[in-house]
A protein has these predicted regions:
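Single conserved hydrophobic/aromatic residue that forms the stacking wall/gate
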Residues: 281-291
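C-terminal beta-strand-loop-alpha-helix "lid" module of Rossmann-like NAD(P)-dependent dehydrogenases
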Residues: 1-283
Length: 291
């Protein structure tokens, strides 16, 4: 009982810590999300309004290699948060240990996929402790360099979308090459704004230079968005897991207390029964008293 109480106190403390971290992470996600959405919508609209455009960022390179930026956590005790993100990679037949390299953000995911045989091309696990745009830029610079050199043909991002403390959604997003038809469909869903009324965009000096400037920022923004969302999701999942663990500990303590009290009551009853039996056995009978 004492060990369960001790565990319950630990999980309750972890729940409170995660709750504080979650509030901070939620603020960061809410403040940053409009920028990520605006960046995505700008690129979607730009490609949609540019007519036929040929650019390396819009076309698959000659390499069949795939790069996956996998965002998990450095700590466990977060329910299925880490395993659900890892499964998006390991259960997808498109990503084999031969054709996929992993850029790991988070030791839990890194260790899991490494055991599965995937190559870890980069380890940025410290970036998830406190998401910074500088860390996202560093990761983006590395994968973009490999893409432009033709060493990898596709770049994917696996992260977890934060909905609320009860719901976190593991998600895979393709970063490059940008699929013009898909992103054009997204552009059609963008709310009416001045850019939607433009039928065609002209670039000076050239569309290629415009994309060379904006696509790296686009990739970095999506990576940073993934870091921020995943950080909030991790703390939400951990808070929920610790809340469940605390409730289970309290339920177990209640059950153990009931069993303990019943056992104690049975023991006392047994002792009283034995005492009474002993007294009855040793006390003289009425016949003995008359004699």
């Amino acid at each position: 009982k004492e060990s369960v109480q001790s565990t319950g106190q630990i999980t309750k403390a972890m729940k409170l810590v995660s709750s504080v971290k979650l509030q901070k992470a939620k603020v960061g996600a809410e403040v940053s999300k409009p920028y990520f959405d605006a960046m995505y919508e700008a690129v979607a609209a730009m490609i949609a309004k540019s007519g036929e455009m040929s650019h390396p960022f819009l076309q698959k390179s000659r390499s069949d290699k795939k790069a996956v930026i996998l965002i998990t956590s450095n700590r466990g005790l977060a329910g299925g948060y880490n395993s659900n993100a890892v499964k998006l990679l390991t259960k997808d037949e498109r990503f084999t240990t031969e054709n996929t390299v992993v850029y790991a953000v988070g030791t839990k995911g890194r260790d899991s996929v490494e055991r599965e045989g995937y190559t870890i091309a980069g380890d940025y696990s410290e970036a998830i402790n406190e998401p910074l745009y500088a860390d996202a830029s560093e990761i983006g610079k590395e994968v973009l360099s490999k893409f432009t050199m033709g060493e990898i043909g596709e770049i994917y991002l696996i992260y977890t979308i934060f909905k609320n403390t009860m719901v976190q959604i593991p998600t895979m997003m393709k970063l490059l090459p940008i699929n013009a038809s898909d992103i054009t469909a997204d552009a059609e869903d963008v709310e009416e704004n001045p850019i939607d009324r433009i039928t065609l965009m002209n670039y000076e000096p050239a569309p290629e230079e415009a994309l060379n400037a904006i696509i790296p920022k686009y990739v970095n923004s999506l990576i940073f968005g993934g870091l921020v969302e995943s950080h909030a999701s991790e703390n939400g999942a951990r808070m929920q897991a610790m809340d469940s663990a605390t409730s289970n500990a309290e339920e177990m303590i209640s059950d153990l207390s009931l069993k303990y009290n019943r056992a104690r009551q049975a023991s006392i009853t047994q002792e009283l029964t034995e005492i009474i039996a002993c007294l009855l056995y040793t006390s003289p009978s009425p016949r003995d008293k008359r004699q």
